[in-house]
Amino acid sequence: MEYKFEMGQGKLRVVVPKELDHHLATQLKEEADLLIETYHVKTLIFDFTNTEFMDSSGIGVIMGRYRHIFLLGGEVWAIHTSERMRQILNMSGVTKIIQIYEEGMM
């Protein structure tokens, strides 16, 4: 599965693919940055519903988009994270800068 974007009410939702690695990272971040700038996105949501694997380039995508959104006065969320994805996000330090929401918390 490839990634996809969904826009609405100043929010950009990135449905992260099953595997986010260096093969997709560059394309995903370029497209996300373009959408953030074009639509003045204030909330970026990474949806990990389908994600089973993410390497350091995937972490880089999240961190880079966080910096971009933060400079615009916005925020970044992660939703639908599995236990495995929460471990990856915790170990990488991502959870110190973005919010993780579970079903029904948003």
Region roles according to the model:
Residues 1-52, 67-106:
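STAS-like cytosolic regulatory interaction modules
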Residues 62-66:
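Histidine-anchored nucleotide/phosphate-binding helix
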